[in-house]
Amino acid sequence: MRKVAIYGKGGIGKSTTTQNTVAALAEMGRKVLVVGCDPKADSTRLLLGGLAQKTVLDTLREEGEDVELDLVRKTGFGNTLCVESGGPEPGVGCAGRGIITAVNLMEQLGGYESDSPLDYVFYDVLGDVVCGGFAMPIREGKAEEVYIVCSGEMMAMYAANNICKGIRKFADAGSVKLGGLICNSRMVDNEKEMIAEFAKRLGTQMIHFVPRDNDVQRAEINKKTVIEWNPQAKQADEYRALAKAIDNNQMFVVPKPISVDELESLLVEFGVIS
């Protein structure tokens, strides 16, 4: 079973990218479990046809310790298994801690097992690696390969570089490696070439460039992934290509983060900042 974590700046499109990629993997016959590690609990919505799934933490609060697996693990598009860790009540407690609680409960309940063996578990993780709880999937060895969703915007690249620092920190202690950058296009000038160069400097690859397409939003309005909403769409093929690239990936590295000065000079070089 491959254990994958998807990281990236808040609002970059991690959850949308993850769900569309997972839908494409399911279409390829892969058995996938998605664990949403975000208090917003929107990591599985499109796979479940818009269903706002009950989170592990909400269920624990309501049911106490006596929780059945069926309450927190739902089946979505293409027989994907979907779990949302959820978060604490606003203003109380630590969301990172919630991820730890949710993953531990899933292990106790046998949530990582199914009728047919799992090929993948995907952790869709909130934002930047700013606190230990959100770093938990890579720190505790729950995830072994990381993909970072970024774009040609400065803050997205800055966040990606920071996440590489986190991976580097935990790579010594465990088996976590970076599998590549996924460029979720924001139509920035020279974006594709710049992210390919950025990946090279980090010692990794741009595993796929996902062009911007309004079909993604149209599918979301219909509470579906593009793969399910319009399998013939050009954008569906982009997600299939990304899924195949991940499925066939052999390049796993401990990244070499670059300095802020080097990052800024890269942005200047490609004309993003003057």
Curated annotation (Swiss-Prot):
The keyword Ribonucleoprotein does not apply. CDD domains: NifH (cd02040). The keyword Translocase does not apply. [4Fe-4S] cluster binds at residues 94, 131. InterPro entries: NifH/chlL_CS, NifH/frxC, Nitrogenase_Fe_NifH, P-loop_NTPase. Binds 1 [4Fe-4S] cluster per dimer. It is an enzyme of class 1 (oxidoreductase). One of its GO terms (molecular function) is 4 iron, 4 sulfur cluster binding. Its cofactor is [4Fe-4S] cluster. The reversible ADP-ribosylation of Arg-97 inactivates the nitrogenase reductase and regulates nitrogenase activity. The modification ADP-ribosylarginine is found at residue 97. It catalyses: N2 + 8 reduced [2Fe-2S]-[ferredoxin] + 16 ATP + 16 H2O = H2 + 8 oxidized [2Fe-2S]-[ferredoxin] + 2 NH4(+) + 16 ADP + 16 phosphate + 6 H(+). One of its GO terms (biological process) is nitrogen fixation. Its EC number is 1.18.6.1. Keywords: 4Fe-4S, ADP-ribosylation, ATP-binding, Iron, Iron-sulfur, Metal-binding, Nitrogen fixation, Nucleotide-binding, Oxidoreductase. ATP binds at residues 8-15. It comes from the Bacteria. The key enzymatic reactions in nitrogen fixation are catalyzed by the nitrogenase complex, which has 2 components: the iron protein and the molybdenum-iron protein. Belongs to the NifH/BchL/ChlL family. NCBIfam families: nifH. PANTHER family: LIGHT-INDEPENDENT PROTOCHLOROPHYLLIDE REDUCTASE IRON-SULFUR ATP-BINDING PROTEIN. Homodimer. This is Nitrogenase iron protein. It comes from Dehalococcoides mccartyi (strain ATCC BAA-2266 / KCTC 15142 / 195).
